[in-house]
Structures are given as structure tokens and as C-alpha cells.
């Protein structure tokens, strides 16, 4: 109850900051919870209850592991999942989003804590929360599409590497002579400390990894990470193995989260401002990406602006109640959907169950071996790395996109996300401007002959055919313009691309999603008049072969003839 009494004034301040005219047009900031409750029923509540409990069980070991990877205490991970998880579900723009600490923040949070302490982290997170609220109020939810696919793929893979490097010490039971902050320094210290490897710790870590790999193949309901925690804790405790546990390194608290105002100074604000911006951008990208994945799974559409406001409120409250940055978690959101969650109530139940865990079971967290925590984070890093996508982009993309991907990846590993995202975006923009400059020189482009393409202003289109014409270059900022399928009685979709001079990997990824959507709806996709550069990208990526050469036609008349055959 104290938590709600503290947070309500914050919501009131947000309301006062919005002009009267803006409040009259606030439907774009309507939480999905209100819509869900309009036709809520006992059956839906039971589904949300079951799903919320299961997701809480999944979130428990992850929240503890991610807290430790972030350089904070185990209970702070639960504080984050409870406070931010509840508020983001209650106020969010998605029906099924589950929020909490995620691996994406681990390295940046650990760096802030090492340099500026917990007060610095709290200030950075509050500032990030305010930025997210402003982004939502100013309807900037759609702006996230301007982050290229290559950058998100690059920094996600880079974050995965930093997590693995950061957990090598605990997995191998090593003793470091100093406490390095940067990833490169951690790797150097690991190599210098190889003589301190604890083989018993390695065995426990390998057992935890094996459980997480093998268990899901036979049992889906009980999370493998929880099984790994229970088995390794019992083994280390029962056999008195010489392996560090959480209790050996941290003092476990069962206190509920309480309001704590951080010490704020100009120096602190100036020091953490770049980190705050990075947290805000990362939270926006991760949460909206999770929403998109959820939309595809449940066939709904989220409210991106309301989601950003909820992320802002959740992160602000998390910081003030002792937590760390939070965002939508794709794995937990997918688990919520698969286990029957149908409304934001499931996320709120998940937070409530974690409160009970914090009060009743948290002392047992002291028994969890550190190699098991490292093994859990290894699996998190593997699952988030998207290494197959990473390699596919390198093999199939234009050289400019590959350059952006590799620059972002290496800068994330060697420096941090602040540098990686900034340099990656700058490079992507410069390469895009070069590409557009090349397009402007008409004689340098070889266009497919469009013979008999304009025999008449209007062409008869069969009733079972949809025709879309795309104009202008298709790059990362225009990928969202790719149409979605509204089938009805339609069996063929023609994309007329005579006015598309250039295509990048982000837009190609959008076309691939459209192709998959067409296949799900049994709609044939046909391309008309694809120019040289887009055709080269499609062939190099294998997309041309997937769609079939017979479905690429030189002009609209030939495309309509193909449609008549289907």
C-alpha cells in the first residue's frame, strides 16, 4: 500500500505537466488495461492468474542473476521486477507485455554503479524515465523505426559478448587481483588469473548449463533455470563443496521496496546524462521490439506511445524504490502468451507473486552457487545474441550495412553502448546520404525496361488481386511503410517497385516479414519492376529464390498476367 501512496503523486505531477488541450486529446495515452477490463471475465482472470504465476517462476532466477550481473544486490533485481513490472503492465500499451530487468542493461548498469555508485544509477534511471515519458507524450513511439536493423543486431550481439566475459570469473570460480570495469579489462584479468581456476566450480557451472540445455527438451512447464538453481544449490549444500554462493558474497534482504530519494548534484547529473540517454533509447527499443513480437503472436496492435509513458513511469518508480532500469522482456512476454495470459492483469499477478517470494523465500537465495548464476547468464546471452541473424546479415547484406553492423558490435564490446549507438547511427546516416547521392546521378543507375507499362492511366485489376506501389528509397527509416495484409477474398499481392532505387537490409527484413505474412494467409506475393540495386540485394540474401523467379516480373502488365494465372 505504501508503494501506491508514493507513486500516485508522481502520476498527478505528470498529469499537470500536460496542457489542457493535450488532455482533451489523450486517447493516444489510454492504457490497455482499461480496454481489457471492459469485457473482463472470470475465465480470463483464471488464465491471467495461471500465466502470472508461471511467469513469476521464470522471472525469479533471471531477476536475481541479472541483478548480480549489473553489480547490485539480488533483491534489487526483484524490486525491479515487482515495481516496474507492475506499473508497466498496469499503464502499458500492450496487453501481454511483461517487464523487468533485462540483459541489455547489465553492462551499462554495472558501469554506472562502478563509476558513480547507487545514487548515480538512481539519478540516471530517473532521468531516463522522464525522457521516456516525454517521448510518449510527444508521440515519438514511431521514431524508434529510425534505429536501423543493423545497429540493433550489432549492439545486441555485443551485449551478449560483454555478459559472457563478465561471468567468466564466477563460472570458473576464479579470484581476480583487481575489479575491472570495461569488457577488455575483464578479459585481460581473466587471462592473467587462469591459475586460480576452481575445477569444482567449473563442474557445478557445467551441470547448470547441461540442465538448461537438456531439460526443456522433455519438460516445458517448469523453467530449466529454476531446476538448475535447485539442483546445484542442493548439491553444493549437501556435499559441502568449495564453491562460492550468493550468501558468501552478498547480504540477502527480505525487506519490501521502500521510497529512497537519491542524492542529486550537478556533477552527478552531468556525469550520468549520456548513460541516461542510452538507457532511455535502449528501453524504448527493447520494449517496442517486445511489443511487436507479442503483436505477431496474438494478432493485436500495441499503443507505442502509451508503452513509452509506462516504461518511463516504471523506470522512475523502480529507481526511487531501490531497483534498476527495466524494460519489456521478450522471453517473459512470450512465456506469458504461451501460458494463456490475455491481459495486463497477468503482468500484475507476476509482480504480486514476486512480492510473496521476496518475503517468504528470499533467504534461500543465499544458497545459490555463483557458477549456476553465471550459467544462467550464459544461456541468456546465447538466446539474446541472435548469432544466426548476425551471420546472415554479414553474408547477405550490402557492404554498407555490414560495416554498420560490425562497427556497432565491436564498439559495444570494446567501449560501451553510448559510443556504439552514437557512432553506429552516424555511420548509417552518412552511408545513407552517400547512397542517395549515388541515386541522384541517373546515368549511374540501370533501370529495368518498363515497356508497355503505361498503356493506359488505369489498368483493370482482378477482384482477387491487391496492388501496392512503393515510391522512393526503402531504407531503415521507411521499413514501416511496407503494407500489412488485409486479405478478405484476395489471393495475390503485387508490389510495384519501379520507383524504388535503393533497398537496405532493414527494409529487406520488412519485405521478408511481409512474405511470411502472405504465406500464412495463403496469399501469393508478386514483384513488379524491381530495379538493379534492390534486385541485387534480394538475390544476395536469398530472398529472390524464396519468393521464386516466376514471381518477379518486369512491369505491371506482366505482373497482372501472373496474377491471372494464380
Protein language model annotation of sequence segments:
Residues 547-562:
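Short acidic-hydrophobic, aromatic-tinged amphipathic segments that line or gate anion-handling sites
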Residues 383-541, 545-546, 564:
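The feature marks cytosolic C-terminal regulatory regions of anion transporters and related permeases
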Residues 99, 527-528, 553:
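Active-site-adjacent beta-strand anchor residues
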Residues 25-443, 447, 542:
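Transmembrane helical cores of multi-pass ion-transport proteins
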Residues 6-22:
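Short, positively charged and aromatic/hydrophobic N-terminal segments
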Amino acid at each position: 500500500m505504501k508503494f501506491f501512496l508514493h507513486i500516485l503523486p508522481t502520476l498527478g505531477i505528470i498529469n499537470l505537466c500536460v496542457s489542457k488541450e493535450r488532455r482533451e486529446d489523450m486517447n493516444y495515452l489510454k492504457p490497455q488495461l482499461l480496454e481489457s477490463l471492459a469485457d473482463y471475465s472470470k475465465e480470463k482472470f483464471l488464465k491471467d492468474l495461471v500465466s502470472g504465476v508461471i511467469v513469476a517462476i521464470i522471472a525469479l532466477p533471471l531477476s536475481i542473476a541479472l541483478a548480480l550481473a549489473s553489480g547490485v544486490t539480488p533483491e534489487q533485481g526483484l524490486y525491479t521486477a515487482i515495481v516496474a513490472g507492475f506499473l508497466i503492465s498496469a499503464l502499458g500499451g500492450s496487453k501481454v507485455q511483461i517487464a523487468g530487468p533485462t540483459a541489455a542493461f547489465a553492462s551499462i548498469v554495472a558501469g554506472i554503479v562502478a563509476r558513480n555508485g547507487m545514487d548515480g544509477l538512481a539519478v540516471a534511471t530517473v532521468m531516463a524515465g522522464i525522457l521516456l515519458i516525454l517521448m510518449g507524450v510527444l508521440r515519438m513511439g514511431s521514431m524508434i523505426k529510425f534505429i536501423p536493423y543493423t545497429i540493433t543486431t550489432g549492439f545486441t550481439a555485443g551485449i551478449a559478448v560483454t555478459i559472457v566475459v563478465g561471468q567468466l570469473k564466477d563460472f570458473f570460480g576464479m579470484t581476480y587481483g583487481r575489479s575491472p570495469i570495461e569488457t577488455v579489462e575483464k578479459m585481460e584479468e581473466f587471462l592473467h588469473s587462469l591459475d586460480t581456476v576452481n575445477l569444482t566450480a567449473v563442474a557445478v557451472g557445467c551441470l547448470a548449463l547441461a540442465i538448461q540445455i537438456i531439460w526443456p527438451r522433455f519438460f516445458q512447464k517448469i523453467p530449466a533455470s529454476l531446476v538448475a538453481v535447485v539442483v546445484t544449490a542442493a548439491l553444493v549444500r549437501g556435499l559441502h563443496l568449495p564453491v562460492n554462493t550468493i550468501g558468501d558474497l552478498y547480504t540477502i534482504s527480505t525487506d519490501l521496496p521502500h521510497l529512497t530519494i537519491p542524492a542529486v548534484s550537478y556533477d552527478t547529473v552531468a556525469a550520468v546524462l549520456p548513460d541516461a540517454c542510452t538507457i532511455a533509447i535502449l528501453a524504448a527499443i527493447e520494449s517496442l521490439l517486445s511489443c511487436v513480437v507479442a503483436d505477431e503472436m496474438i494478432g493485436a496492435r500495441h499503443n507505442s506511445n502509451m508503452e513509452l509513458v509506462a516504461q518511463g513511469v516504471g523506470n522512475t518508480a523502480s529507481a526511487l524504490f531501490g531497483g534498476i532500469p527495466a524494460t519489456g522482456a521478450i522471453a517473459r512476454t512470450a512465456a506469458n502468451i504461451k501460458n494463456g495470459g490475455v491481459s495486463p492483469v497477468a503482468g500484475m499477478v507476476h509482480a504480486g507473486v514476486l512480492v510473496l517470494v521476496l518475503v517468504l523465500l528470499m533467504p534461500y537465495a543465499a544458497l545459490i552457487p555463483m557458477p549456476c548464476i553465471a550459467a544462467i547468464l550464459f544461456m541468456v546471452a546465447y538466446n539474446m545474441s541472435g548469432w544466426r541473424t548476425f551471420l546472415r546479415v554479414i553474408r547477405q547484406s550490402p557492404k554498407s550495412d555490414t560495416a554498420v553492423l560490425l562497427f556497432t558490435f565491436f564498439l559495444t564490446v570494446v567501449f560501451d553502448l553510448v559510443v556504439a549507438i552514437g557512432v553506429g547511427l552516424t555511420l548509417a546516416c552518412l552511408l545513407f546520404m552517400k547512397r542517395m547521392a549515388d541515386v541522384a546521378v541517373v546515368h549511374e543507375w540501370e533501370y529495368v525496361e518498363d515497356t508497355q507499362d503505361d498503356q493506359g492511366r488505369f489498368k483493370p485489376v482482378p477482384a482477387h488481386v491487391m496492388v501496392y506501389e512503393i515510391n522512393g528509397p526503402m531504407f531503415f527509416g521507411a521499413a514501416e511503410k511496407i503494407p500489412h495484409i488485409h486479405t478478405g477474398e484476395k489471393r495475390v499481392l503485387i508490389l510495384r517497385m519501379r520507383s524504388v532505387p535503393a533497398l537496405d537490409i532493414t527494409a529487406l527484413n520488412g519485405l521478408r516479414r511481409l512474405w511470411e505474412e502472405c504465406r500464412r494467409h495463403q496469399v501469393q506475393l508478386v514483384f513488379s519492376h524491381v530495379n538493379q540495386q534492390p534486385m541485387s540485394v534480394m538475390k544476395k540474401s536469398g530472398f529472390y529464390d524464396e519468393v521464386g523467379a516466376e514471381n518477379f516480373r518486369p512491369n505491371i502488365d506482366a505482373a497482372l498476367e501472373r496474377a491471372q494465372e494464380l
